[in-house]
């Protein structure tokens, strides 16, 4: 905690809400260690904008963009265009990369990726993203490959996308072992990072929102009242069919 690595706090800290204790879909919520996780709301921000800070934007930004050390002029490949992948695209755009390539198998999410700042989109169900990235980089590969899905195939794709001396930033939450081809990675000086979000970037995003430097409201694709709770969850669970990104529930009047 003293190092600002709040996701790894010892003695009862770290990832608590929705993990070790119940989440926040309740009338009242007790927030442990609130000094490191609550912030005053700036004037000029909406509730929907603030929802995106808990925690897709810090996740894509910290675990993807900052861990990947995105630099001006980089070519960045983002594997997965769900809300966290889109957050990584939005965050990467702040660093003026030369090119951002978004990769997904859902055309609706690739359309969203264009709105969030991707220069090129690739549906890897039909096209080879490795060929696309190599064509953009004279055969070198991406400076940074960000994995935002969490399955073995997408991590292995990130390995294929990255250039020698490049960086792979893994955001995806993996539930199964992944093959790590070290015999190929170590000779190419590839750096791999992983991690939980620490949300230390939340103050940065809170400064950006009132000035409209980023448009985070576009994450919200569906809105429901709490009376339609079950329908809202059904829509979100079928995101590939419904084109849902983020679903907002509001209390009935």
Per-segment meaning from a language model:
Residues 77, 101, 167-169, 193, ...:
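Structural detector of well-ordered beta-strand residues that form the stable sheet scaffold
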Residues 43-127, 131:
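Mid-domain Rossmann-like dinucleotide-binding core that forms the NAD(H)/NADP(H) cofactor-binding site
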Residues 1-38:
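Glycine-rich phosphate/adenylate-binding loop and adjacent beta-alpha elements
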Residues 6, 25-26, 38, 57-60, ...:
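A general structural signal for well-ordered alpha-helical segments in protein cores
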Residues 104, 172, 196:
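Conserved acidic E/D residue at the C-terminus of a beta-strand in Rossmann-like folds
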């Amino acid at each position: 905690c003293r190092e600002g690595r709040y996701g790894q706090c010892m003695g009862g800290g770290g990832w608590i809400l929705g993990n070790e204790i119940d989440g926040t879909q309740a009338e009242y919520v007790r927030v442990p260690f609130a000094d490191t996780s609550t912030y005053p709301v700036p004037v000029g921000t909406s509730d929907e904008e603030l929802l995106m800070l808990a925690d897709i934007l810090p996740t894509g930004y910290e675990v993807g963009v900052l861990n990947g050390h995105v630099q001006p002029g980089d070519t960045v490949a983002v594997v997965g265009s769900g809300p966290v992948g889109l957050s990584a695209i939005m965050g990467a755009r702040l660093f003026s990369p030369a090119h951002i390539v978004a990769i997904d198998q859902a055309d609706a999410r690739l359309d969203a990726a264009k709105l969030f700042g991707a220069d090129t989109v690739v549906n890897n169900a039909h096209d080879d993203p490795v060929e696309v990235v190599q064509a953009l980089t004279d055969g070198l590969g991406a400076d940074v490959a960000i994995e935002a899905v969490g399955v073995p195939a997408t991590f292995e794709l990130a390995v294929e996308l990255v250039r020698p001396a490049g960086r792979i930033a893994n955001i995806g939450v993996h539930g199964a072992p992944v093959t790590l081809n070290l015999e190929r990675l170590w000779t190419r000086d590839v750096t791999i990072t992983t991690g939980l979000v620490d949300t230390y970037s939340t103050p940065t995003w809170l400064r950006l929102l009132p000035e409209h430097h980023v448009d985070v409201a576009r994450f919200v694709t569906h809105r429901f009242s709490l009376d339609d709770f079950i329908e809202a969850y059904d829509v979100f669970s079928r995101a590939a069919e419904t084109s849902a990104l983020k679903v907002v529930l509001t209390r009935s009047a």
